[in-house]
């Protein structure tokens, strides 16, 4: 480096690196404090900044909170351990109970569904903290099921977690046997994607109806009663596509427990009941469209549904119900004949019945025309004032659209994980749609023996990058200001075999225009945390 006419001339590569190191350390020190940004560096300097400099600096200035020895949730204290991964932003939302909040769109949707099952007992206030045994073991989830992973589930400690589905209460409710029919609606928690359709806390509703063989003189008498109950159900004008037989090898009858006649009549009762519910929901959606001056479904063609064979861990045979809506088939729910071993675990071997599960957000977004799942958590009066459970359903009127602020982050994965596949989608994160009774869909297992409560959750995995971790970091730092996180490039260097990923993070406030400085500050903090936790090298 030499001086010429009062200016310092950088003449060698080493000097360039030292100069860039000095500048970026100053800038990033301020950036990590929230008052300046790496992106404010001169364009001529930014290319000189090496990922190693960014890594060292961010590691130095990224804040790292000490893990508490216990978590206080809903007035109770839970010890933490190496499995604990529940962030404060999730705990701060625990107990909001949007599904029972008066005049909230989720509550209105829940009530509309429950109205079609007037004799069912409704469980709407079950606690969200459950045991591993309740959430997984009691339902027959195998020890290596991906839903058990810390990358997918919020653990309070190794034996306790935030429920991932309403089915965590299923065995307990069946065992209590307070009513032949019930619904459960609740908030559920899963680590997963960041976009307009996914949120780490969402709401499920499940229902089930059973008949007690002990109340009848024979199986035939029970079948006759179910037939009478079926004939008493409301008839509807739906066009129904149901081309498959009730059971077949790909969708099997539970031959150890059910006769063909029992499965047939239970399936008929199930399908008619859920078709009636769908008519109610989509009729209201059609009315709301008409009131808003939009083209309604009924103007083009009658409402039609179709039954599609499916596989779920708690039912067999099983189906998904799809509705033809605005030019496309929309999956609404999963359902089936209850898996008899589940009833055995609930000490109800004499009962037979059906169950269904659905996502409340999915139906509420359709019913009210709500475009972004984050809105359900808004306390903005401009949102909440649009809904009134005492009045007909009306379409949501959006606020003025605030501009998006996209930012990209590109990084090399550490050498220890390069070449290994990135996990972008597992059964627990692929969708918020539940299987029957709210459970997580999975593939059939080659093992038919259910797991028992003494089977342990797999060992805590070593720290390695998982896409859900980036989603979690983004939500922890940016909260609801991050609208979308998407992988846009996955590159492996042909010679060095190092793997690079590039993600686009879109920032957008629902309530006001976000400044460039605010977006840059959030992005810098997310980048610093990514480097701190996983040792990635920013490109």
Tell what function each PLM region has.
Residues 300, 308-444, 449-539:
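A carboxyl-terminal module marker
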Residues 69-90, 231-250, 396-397:
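N-terminal, Lys/Arg- and Ser/Thr-rich interaction peptides
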Residues 199-213, 217-268, 352-358, 362-368:
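A conserved active-site cap/scaffold subdomain adjacent to cofactor or substrate pockets
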Residues 217-257, 284-300, 417-464:
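Intrinsically disordered, low-complexity domain-flanking/linker segments in eukaryotic proteins
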Residues 124-150, 284-325, 489-496:
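Beta-rich nucleic-acid/ligand-interaction surfaces
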Residues 1-66:
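N-terminal mitochondrial targeting presequence
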Residues 2, 26-29, 41-44, 63-204, ...:
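Class II aminoacyl-tRNA synthetase-like tRNA-binding/catalytic domains
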Residues 101-109, 262-273, 462-470, 518-522:
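Short amphipathic alpha-helical segments
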């Amino acid at each position: 480096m030499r001086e010429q006419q009062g200016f310092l001339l950088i003449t060698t590569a080493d000097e360039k690196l030292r100069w860039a190191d000095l500048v970026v350390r100053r800038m990033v020190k301020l950036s990590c404090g929230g008052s300046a940004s790496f992106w404010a560096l001169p364009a001529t300097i930014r290319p000189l900044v090496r990922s190693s400099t960014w890594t060292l600096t961010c590691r130095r200035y990224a804040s790292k909170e000490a893990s508490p020895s216990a978590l206080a949730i809903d007035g109770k204290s839970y010890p933490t351990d190496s499995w604990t991964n529940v962030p404060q932003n999730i705990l701060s939302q625990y107990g909001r109970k949007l599904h029972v909040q008066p005049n909230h769109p989720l509550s209105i949707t829940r009530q509309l569904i429950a109205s079609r099952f007037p004799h069912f007992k409704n469980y709407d206030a079950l606690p969200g903290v459950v045991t591993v045994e309740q959430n997984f073991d009691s339902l027959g989830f195998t020890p290596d099921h991906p839903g058990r992973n810390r990358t997918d589930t919020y653990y309070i400690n190794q034996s306790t977690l935030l429920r991932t589905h309403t089915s965590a209460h299923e065995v307990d409710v069946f065992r209590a046997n307070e009513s032949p029919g019930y619904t459960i609606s609740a908030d559920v928690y899963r680590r997963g994607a960041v976009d307009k359709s996914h949120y780490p806390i969402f709401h499920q509703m499940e229902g089930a109806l059973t008949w007690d063989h002990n109340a009848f003189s024979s199986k035939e008498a029970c079948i006759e009663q179910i037939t009478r109950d079926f004939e008493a159900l409301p008839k509807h004008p739906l066009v129904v596509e149901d081309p498959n037989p009730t059971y077949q090898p790909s969708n099997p009858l539970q031959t150890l427990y059910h006769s063909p006649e029992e499965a047939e009549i239970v399936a008929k009762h199930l399908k008619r009941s859920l078709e009636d519910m769908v008519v109610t929901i989509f009729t209201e959606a059609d009315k709301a469209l008409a009131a808003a001056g939009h083209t309604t479904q009924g103007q083009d063609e009658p409402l039609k549904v179709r039954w599609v064979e499916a596989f779920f861990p708690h039912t067999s045979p099983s189906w998904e119900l799809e509705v033809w809506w605005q030019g496309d088939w929309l999956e609404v729910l999963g359902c089936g004949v209850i898996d008899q071993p589940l009833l055995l675990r609930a000490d109800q071997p004499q009962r037979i019945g059906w169950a269904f599960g659905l996502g409340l957000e999915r139906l509420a977004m359709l019913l009210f025309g709500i475009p972004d799942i984050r809105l359900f958590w808004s306390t903005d009066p401009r949102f909440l004032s649009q809904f009134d459970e005492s009045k007909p359903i009306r379409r949501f009127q959006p606020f003025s659209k605030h501009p998006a602020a996209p930012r990209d982050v590109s990084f090399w994965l550490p050498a220890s994980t390069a070449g290994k596949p990135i996990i972008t989608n597992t059964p627990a994160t692929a969708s918020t749609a539940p299987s029957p009774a709210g459970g997580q869909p999975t593939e059939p297992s080659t093992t038919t023996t259910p797991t028992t409560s003494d089977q342990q959750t797999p060992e805590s995995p070593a720290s390695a990058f998982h896409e859900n971790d980036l989603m979690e970091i983004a939500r922890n730092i940016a909260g609801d200001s991050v609208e979308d996180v998407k992988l846009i490039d996955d590159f492996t260097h042909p010679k060095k075999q190092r793997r690079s990923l590039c993600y686009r993070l879109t920032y957008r406030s629902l309530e006001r225009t976000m400044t460039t400085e605010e977006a840059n500050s959030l992005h810098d903090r997310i980048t610093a945390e990514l480097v701190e936790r996983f040792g990635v090298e920013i490109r």
